[in-house]
């Protein structure tokens, strides 16, 4: 009898991923990225955490079509005068959903370079469920350096997931 396949879930901080990749000078193709996660890491479900902006409805539909399970966070306008910046910090949602889903997966991939996920990553490692931390670039939080053996930069497989 063959070994049973592990159930792998990815938990993606979309803003951290998108802005981190843009800071490296390229744009991510989310559909290619989803296919890469399935092919490389056997990701069964990819949860994409994103701030909800009504005018981006078609983007959300295309992400669903690409195979993401979208978890929305309500957004608020930034406090800086005249910035017009919209904020939708998804950290709490990502941690909460990774714990809600905890009994359903054998391994997790956290996609973010944000140090706010330190306690989640530490817990997943302790429970032998941390597979990878995929960071958008090399400027990830120093808090995550303790988990260096799990860290992979998106830049290493950029050619497979970039737009265009």
Regions found by a protein language model. Name each.
Residues 1-90, 130, 138-139:
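Domain-level signal for Mg2+-assisted phosphodiester chemistry and nucleotide/NA-binding surfaces
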Residues 54-164:
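Nuclease catalytic cores that cleave nucleic-acid phosphodiester bonds
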